[in-house]
Amino acid sequence: MEIGLVHYRVGETDGVSLEMVKWKQALRNMHLKTYLIAGDMGTSPGFKIPYIAYTDKRSNILKQKSFVNLDEWDENYFKKEMNKYIEDIYNQLYEMMDLDVMIVNNIFSLAHNPAAAVAIYRFCKDNGIKMIGHHHDFYWERDFYKNPTNDYIKEILEEYFPPKDITHVVINSLAQEELKNKKGLDSIVIPNVFDFNQKRWEIDDYNIKIYDKLNISQKDLIFLQATRIVRRKAIELAIDTVAEVKKDLKKYIGKTTFNGKKITQDTNVFLVLPGLSEESDYVEVLKEYASQKDVELKLAFSISDDIRHEEEEIFSLWDFYAIADFITYPSILEGFGNQFLEAIFAKTPVLMFEYPVYKKDIAPLGFEVVSLGSKAEYERGMYRVNQNEIIKAKEEIFQILFDPQGLHRLSRRILNLGKNIFPMKLWRKS
């Protein structure tokens, strides 16, 4: 049996790309031939379909015409352009003809590229390829997609997002309920999983160079924000919390952290962001806000990738986890939470906002985190939580930083929970 995993991109550090690699490995462990298919392959081997890349010009034009404004186009012209794009994508799929199964990641659910959804569905139908829709996010969850501009795009959303006659997989129980309520479709829940048996992420002779690359002392404290840089990640909440930590750090001069860093007059605190920067205006907002709050941001995407490239001094995302003292994960909305699983494996304490899926599917399992609560307001382009939550989180962070035995017990218990609840072998049971 030959299986294709398709998405707009792979070989990056975003959640869908990372999860596709896990599925590929799990399927190959079951002795199934498995291939990655994407518009942009990043560092991964596989089949490239350029027309479905996030950066494709026609994709972005039609996305704007579909959900923002038709402008000078009328509906007939829109339909003509959309159909031509569908045909072009269809024709690029010819190398996939021998597949038995196509696992379609987010293309049938998020509506970033409606033409890709139609083309892939028709191609699979025409060639007898079974389809599994792996839905990480739904278009109705995002404000951008809530106002289609014409009847043709409404028809496409109704028929192909997602198609009714395929197998559906979602990554949390809230998504399962929504898909049933909105579309009348049943689905299987397979949460994000993780290979807890892989080699530990530890500081070594290579990743220790990150300190010099970012002009950080090995004695400084590093808070790691490992997500992409987009608004729903609410990185401003990490800035708020780090600002409070930095403000009170001098009270702890002379103390030693759980990982052996002695706090001195010169100890600094950094918020390091190695993730993809996908909203340039938001990056500027964060820079300005961090400056106001006296927090030093280190944007590290230029030296980060999904795997190491030692000849170019590029580090993997896991290298950044190895040097982190604390993980920040204040996302307002997540399909599941890859960074949460990564923090568990890294045995690094995590600060997080309790987004809906975390509250529903993860928190009841017994994980312990430093919480920013579950209520946030969006005002003037940024998310806010009650200042009392920030102060409470700061106090818990200091308690963890200077209690090595307590952290050891906590991280060991949480790691064991993670191994038992979200292992790669969960795949075989689903």
UniProtKB/Swiss-Prot annotation:
It comes from the Bacteria. Keywords: Glycosyltransferase, Transferase. It catalyses: (2R)-2-O-(alpha-D-glucopyranosyl)-glycerate + GDP-alpha-D-mannose = (2R)-2-O-[alpha-D-mannopyranosyl-(1->2)-alpha-D-glucopyranosyl]-glycerate + GDP + H(+). The keyword Transferase applies. InterPro entries: Glyco_trans_1 (IPR001296). Pfam families: Glycos_transf_1. Its EC number is 2.4.1.-. One of its GO terms (molecular function) is glycosyltransferase activity. Its cofactor is a divalent metal cation. GO terms for biological process: lipopolysaccharide biosynthetic process. Belongs to the glycosyltransferase group 1 family. Involved in the biosynthesis of the compatible solute mannosylglucosylglycerate through a nonphosphorylating pathway. Catalyzes the synthesis of mannosylglucosylglycerate (MGG) from glucosylglycerate (GG) and GDP-mannose. PANTHER family: GLYCOSYLTRANSFERASE WBBK-RELATED. This is Mannosylglucosylglycerate synthase. It comes from Petrotoga mobilis (strain DSM 10674 / SJ95). The lineage of its organism: Bacteria, Thermotogati, Thermotogota, Thermotogae, Petrotogales.
